[in-house]
A protein has these predicted regions:
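Sequence/fold signature of self-assembling virion shell proteins
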Residues: 72-81, 115-266
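Long, contiguous amphipathic alpha-helices that act as assembly "spine/axial" helices in icosahedral shell
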Residues: 4-62, 95-104, 109, 193, ...
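Short, solvent-exposed cationic patches
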Residues: 92, 99, 188
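Alpha-helical scaffold segments that mediate packing/assembly in large oligomeric complexes
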Residues: 19-95, 240-265
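Active-site loops and adjacent core secondary-structure elements that bind or stabilize anionic groups
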Residues: 1
């Protein structure tokens, strides 16, 4: 009998500000650090999560990924994120594909959806349409956010490409996207976030120390390595993961796409 198993990651960092810096800045640098602390931790956690997902899809969840990116330059509509692409991704899970209701994308992909949503189509094909007008309907009329697409709530995060989909020379830049459901990706903590501060009178410094001990876990998967406290690079390593459910019972799909808003190549 297989058991699901998460791996705990221990993370910590510290900052120090000396009196000379305060005098030179004429402000409170430590105050600025405190104001940015929550955003900084979220950014670090997101990078860790997407490293985790890249590792899972390396081998263990290989059956649940769809790559429509062009193996070269000059990608076209078939290589972009479209409703058709979403349908193909749902199909990987069979009848359970209908459960997928969250779409996680890079901002560059999201702004392409925004661009397309501001068009009124008089033809059936984006690539061959000749009578397209801006501002006719869809998103962007009163709200710049891409709230939903193809039946999914859209979550935008630049950390999705923490692990690059490809680095093949001459390939147009590729982007990961993830389809999932609420409750598939879980977060647990071994101990709560701890923030400590003190004054070092010898060095004339204010010191701030932060540590947290948490785990991300995708239902139906397991950490398949004897070691614990992995780095992000270890989390992204394919052979360190396994699945304990059949792949189509795990509501998580990875897509790899291009976008016309970034035509740069590796």
């Amino acid at each position: 009998m297989y058991k699901r198993q998460a791996t705990i990651c221990h993370r910590a960092f510290a900052y120090a500000v000396d009196d000379i810096a305060v005098l030179a800045a004429g402000e409170d640098p430590m105050g600025h650090i405190r104001n940015q602390l929550a955003d900084a931790i979220n950014k670090l956690n997101n990078a860790r999560l997407f490293s985790h997902l890249a590792g899972l899809f390396g081998t263990a969840l290989g059956a649940n990924k769809l790559d429509v990116a062009k193996a070269g330059a000059r990608a076209t509509e078939v290589n972009f994120l479209t409703a058709s692409t979403i349908a193909r991704a749902r199909n990987l899970l069979g009848e359970r594909g209908e459960d997928l209701d969250i779409l996680i994308v890079h901002p560059t992909v999201a702004y392409y959806l925004y661009q397309v949503g501001m068009l009124t189509f008089s033809t059936s094909a984006l690539s061959t349409g000749t009578n397209l007008t801006w501002g006719g309907g869809g998103v962007g009329i009163s709200d710049r956010a891409v709230g939903e697409f193809a039946g999914c709530t859209v979550v935008v995060d630049s950390a999705v490409n923490t692990v690059a989909p490809s680095s093949s020379s001459g390939h147009q830049t590729e982007f990961f996207c993830y389809l999932t459901t609420s409750g598939t990706i879980l977060e647990g903590q071994q101990s709560a976030l701890r923030i400590e501060a003190e004054r070092n009178i010898l060095s004339k410094q204010d010191v701030l120390s932060v540590d947290y001990h948490t785990a991300y876990h995708v239902m139906g998967t397991k950490w398949n390595d004897a070691g614990d406290n992995p780095t992000n690079a270890n989390l992204a390593t394919a052979n360190k993961w396994a699945i304990t459910y059949d792949a189509d019972l795990i509501p998580l799909v990875q897509l790899t796409v291009n976008t016309p808003l970034d035509t740069s190549t590796y």
